[in-house]
């Protein structure tokens, strides 16, 4: 999409075999960087955010759906982060969350794309952030069943120790699966490391 739809000149795609990560030392943060924190199918994930410099020129755009509530995220390194608030805790993926850093908001308010943005995707009007969407205003009415389900799940999250508790649970589950796989010679992880 970056090359074919957005036609961003000089785009670099770090292509590696399934289950591997590219060499993160080669990522050019003079440009914007788009990445997935944790691949659901392969299990490949960035180990942490240490590879993202504090003084980067570009913004980071992160799909964190399989990482939020399961991995420790360094929010100071993430400028535009998305995840489905249902899928991340076991529900269907129908509604999304967008978290923007001040740097991302500044870019939205100062950059004018060369093409029209459909109204449903616009986040600025007259070079100012449309902040209502971040205060609970919605474009469409979300399913109240989904909202109630999520509130229920958040109560469960709170009961197991909150965000830290879900990360601990994810790490414990990984340890159990790793121990089991290490005992069976015909099984292995799709992810190399």
Feature locations, PLM:
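Active-site C-terminal subdomain of aminotransferase-like
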Residues: 86-171, 175
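Conserved active-site segment immediately N-terminal to the catalytic lysine
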Residues: 61, 75-86, 96
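Active-site phosphate-binding strand-loop segment of PLP-dependent enzymes
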Residues: 11-68, 80
